[in-house]
Amino acid sequence: MGRLFGTDGVRGVANRELTAELALALGAATAQHLASSTGPGRRVAVVGRDPRASGEMLEAAVIAGLTSQGVDALRVGVLPTPAVAYLTGAYDADFGVMISASHNPMPDNGIKIFGPGGHKLDDATENRIESLVAAGPGLRPVGSEIGRVIDAEDAADRYLRHVSKACTTRLDGLTVVVDCAHGAASEVGPRAYRAAGARVIEINADPNGLNINDDCGSTHLEAIRAAVLAHGADLGVAHDGDADRCLAVDANGDLVDGDAIMVVLALAMQEAGELASDTLVTTVMSNLGLHLAMREAGVNVRTTGVGDRYVLEELRAGDYSLGGEQSGHIVMPGLGSTGDGIVTGLRLMTRMVATGASLAALASRMQTLPQVLINVQVTDKATAAAAPSVQAAVDRAETELGDTGRILLRPSGTEPLIRVMVEAADEEAAHRLATSVADAVSAAG
């Protein structure tokens, strides 16, 4: 058996790679690990999902695995990933399980496990769970020792009370378009923004199990741009399928990505004395423009590998208060143990109201260098990335760029892709060099 856990839990095409049998085994193995690491006593796991059709099947299988090993399953239903992380701590549960493939297409699904307090698992714990999956379930409890299933009727309301803490001023007078990606934020996202006082125009908020992320949400911004312009809104916020991301568009329909959002929030927190050690944590994918803006403001930037788990690790290690990714995963440990798209949207709007400035004006503190990202589908990521022809193409591009840009080649942790990213002083050079490297990757893969 190959490694199950990727950079963001276990993912695959539902009912093909990620089967009900595997979901049951993961539930049982996670329960076994908990028993072996915490000793005797009744244990509880929070279980949530996004609305994709396969989630019902996988939820049932995960819960069967948990209860078969004596763990009570607290079922919270369709809620964002950060809600499950928060509720794991709020309910004083032993761990949490989220069934979602985030921004991936509908046929995919995934299983993400949170430890106590809603924190992501470390590699050692994931390895232990994998070894228990391989070993099989072992002895099972019987009678009253079998776990029970409890529906948490107040889960959404608890989460909404939590996210309301992100909004330190009323948003009355602000008009926002919210793209829910037909995903987990479809109910709670608009409710959160309305509760804060904003006038909300919701789009793509009618999930049917099949339409999640379908030409909508944070990976397809055409609809929200059009809606912002059509309604004369102050901004738009777009979430992905599990609502751990937030991207924005300003009143002109222009993108405000995760880098620009981090700059806006970092400056706000620095002004309020809330930016711990005057430090922002981000990944190698962040635009050079972010680094320049932060340097000008006297903010340090700590850089990690790609993936919010690495951002989270650095935040915890340094006791920092803000980090994130260009893709819109923004983490504020004071407001949650993982990225929360709704919290991010509320903080962004709070800054607009507090300053009286438009989103375009706030985001203008960062000047984005032209950046081109090409996703290349490959059969073998390791072989393609290491191919001499690919390395030669990268060397040629780096020679041309010199110190005026950079190139990054990164295998995806969740999909059969290699991401080619090029930043350059002008758009033409970025496109040309990215295409030349992507062509080499495609030929090698």
UniProtKB/Swiss-Prot annotation:
Q: What EC number(s) does its UniProt record assign? A: 5.4.2.10
Q: Which domain of life is it from?
A: Bacteria
Which reaction(s) does the protein catalyse, per the Swiss-Prot or TrEMBL entry?
alpha-D-glucosamine 1-phosphate = D-glucosamine 6-phosphate
Q: What modifications does the entry list under PTM / processing?
A: Activated by phosphorylation.
Q: Which cofactors must be present for this protein to function?
A: Mg(2+)
Member of which family? Belongs to the phosphohexose mutase family.
Annotated CDD domains:
GlmM
The note on cofactor binding and number reads: Binds 1 Mg(2+) ion per subunit.
Keyword Metal-binding part of the UniProt annotation: yes
Alphabetized HAMAP family for the sequence? GlmM_B (MF_01554_B)
- Give the GO biological process terms: carbohydrate metabolic process; peptidoglycan biosynthetic process; UDP-N-acetylglucosamine biosynthetic process
Which keywords are on file for this protein?
Isomerase, Magnesium, Metal-binding, Phosphoprotein
The residues responsible for catalysis, as annotated, are: 102 (phosphoserine intermediate)
Give the species this sequence originates from. Mycobacterium ulcerans (strain Agy99)
The molecule here is called: Phosphoglucosamine mutase
